[in-house]
């Protein structure tokens, strides 16, 4: 299982799954506490938008929201290791 309170582990999981699904990640610093993520498909369309908390241990509700928000691309339990 990916550590739900570890930003780097969550980020790496998103990047790995994105490559597997043929998506490109664009990251932007929204605030000092979170990153905005855009996932682009091969045709250049935005497949998903998400907020990724930099300190997920402090904001577990944002991790839950992130997991739900990307489930349509990666599956319901995408934060679980394969």
Outline where the language-model segments fall:
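Basic nucleic-acid-binding interfaces
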Residues: 1-29, 38-82
């Amino acid at each position: 299982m990916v550590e739900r309170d570890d930003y780097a582990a969550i980020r790496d999981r998103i990047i790995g799954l994105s490559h597997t699904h043929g998506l490109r990640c664009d990251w932007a610093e929204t605030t000092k506490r979170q990153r905005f993520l855009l996932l682009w498909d091969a045709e250049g369309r935005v497949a998903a938008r998400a907020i990724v908390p930099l300190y997920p241990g402090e904001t577990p509700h944002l991790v839950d929201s992130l997991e739900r928000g990307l489930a349509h691309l990666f599956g319901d339990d995408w934060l679980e290791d394969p």
